[in-house]
From Swiss-Prot:
The keyword Aminoacyl-tRNA synthetase does not apply. It catalyses: adenosine(37) in tRNA1(Val) + S-adenosyl-L-methionine = N(6)-methyladenosine(37) in tRNA1(Val) + S-adenosyl-L-homocysteine + H(+). This is tRNA1(Val) (adenine(37)-N6)-methyltransferase. Specifically methylates the adenine in position 37 of tRNA(1)(Val) (anticodon cmo5UAC). Belongs to the methyltransferase superfamily. tRNA (adenine-N(6)-)-methyltransferase family. It comes from Bacteroides fragilis (strain YCH46). Keywords: Cytoplasm, Methyltransferase, S-adenosyl-L-methionine, Transferase, tRNA processing. It is found in: Cytoplasm. One of its GO terms (molecular function) is tRNA (adenine-N6)-methyltransferase activity. One of its GO terms (biological process) is methylation. PROSITE patterns: N6_MTASE (PS00092). Its EC number is 2.1.1.223. HAMAP family: tRNA_methyltr_YfiC (MF_01872).
Length: 237
């Protein structure tokens, strides 16, 4: 049985009540997202609260951690309460579509999301895991429409998605007035094609700076670049 928690340098994330466990995608999102000068941050689909906690560690902003699943929201709240930044992070258990419609007068300097990524694929019997993994409950169109309503004029939206969804996601984003400014192609082993990508969007059209990140040079041997990006979080970096 896997361990029910993951210990980071400054906080612990319990994930035994959450469908999606602590993973590389979330760690990369929390470490790579630009947060300079951010006063207000929104984490869409916070799950365990991992990304919200990482961003709170990196800056002094207030953070809203939004989660549709009740059990995950409860565990995120518990993880956050035990952390050094409990007073700056608020967990809200609500559907993002409802939240964006009700709160469109609120604006966030930074919005992040590690959204469900399976489309039209076979589902498992676990409804909680389906919600976390399948985008039936929140399509990319709905996500980006809500983001465009809530992002401040000079704000940044950063997302982690499958590489094969990158072009279509950018097309949908541009229809909402959001344009890529940075993109990170994540390669898990030498010689392999990127399977994941992180993209930062703004309302400003500009050349997109593209980078590549190799996470492992061999099995269980992290690359120097990955260590540099995540060393403030992992215990053994």
């Amino acid at each position: 049985m896997s361990q029910p928690f993951f210990q980071f340098k400054q906080f612990t994330v319990w994930h035994d009540k959450c469908a999606m466990k602590v993973g590389t995608d979330g760690v990369l999102l929390g470490a790579w997202t630009p947060v300079e000068s951010s006063a207000r941050i929104l984490d869409i689909g916070t799950g365990t609260g991992l990304v919200a906690l990482m961003l709170a560690q990196r800056c002094s902003a207030s953070v809203i951690a939004l989660e549709i699943d009740g059990k995950a929201a409860q565990q995120a709240a518990e993880n956050i309460t035990r952390s050094p930044w409990g007073s700056r992070i608020e967990v809200v258990c609500q559907d993002f579509r409802l939240y964006s419609n009700k709160n469109n007068s609120l604006k966030y300097d930074t919005i992040v999301s590690n959204p469900p990524y399976f489309t039209d694929s076979l589902k498992c019997p676990d409804s909680q895991r389906n919600t976390a993994r399948h985008n039936d409950n929140l399509s990319y169109e709905e996500l980006l429409k809500g983001v465009s309503n809530l992002l401040s004029p000079n704000g940044t939206f950063t997302v982690v998605i499958p590489m094969d969804a990158s072009d279509s996601f950018k097309d949908i984003a541009s229809s909402q007035g959001l344009y890529p400014s940075r993109q990170l192609l994540v390669i898990t082993k030498p010689g392999a094609p990127p399977k994941r990508t992180l993209i930062s969007f703004t309302f400003i059209k500009q050349d997109c700076k593209e980078e590549k990140l190799l996470t492992e040079v061999a099995r269980h041997r992290y690359s120097d670049e990955y260590i540099k990006l995540t060393r403030e979080f992992y215990l053994k970096m």
